[in-house]
Amino acid sequence: MSYQSGTNKIFYKKNLSWTNNFVKSNIDKIERNYKKHPTRNRWNCNCHVIHDDDLDVEYINFDYLRKKYEKIVKNVTKKYNIEKYHLSDIWYNYYKKGQYQEVHTHAGNGGVTAVHYLLFNNKEHSHTHFIDKNIKSPKIKQGDILFFPCDLQHYVPENETTVPRLTTAFTITKH
């Protein structure tokens, strides 16, 4: 499903039916990792982030995610007219009350960013916000994966609820 913002088609969104099963299989590990490193990340933000190359934490099934995402990426790259690409590392972002993600972009040489909403309640959580006031975020529900150009500045506002918000993210780097 594509979304228009202004005159540009910049978003691609798809709901992934396997999301809830993945969360059930991995949430206990994510919670234990959070208890060890509640604000661990490689950026200037207040959230818990674990990358697929972090070796000092319990490993969630990033291999499963990579296989599933690779299947989707083949179609997404066609929609964005990307012929040669590389799928970056994959990481998860776990936000509890008071946690947020700062304004940022993703390196990707003109590629595409993906955010998969694994635990997301649209009555409790905020969607990904974009700095450009002309860009309206599409409506998101749990299980959605959202693709957008990697150079769009975006952020996640502070989680004001006690309900955790969990996403995974990666970048499709253009060659």
Language-model regions, residue ranges each:
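Glycine-rich loops and low-complexity Gly/Arg-rich segments
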Residues: 36-38, 116-118, 172-174
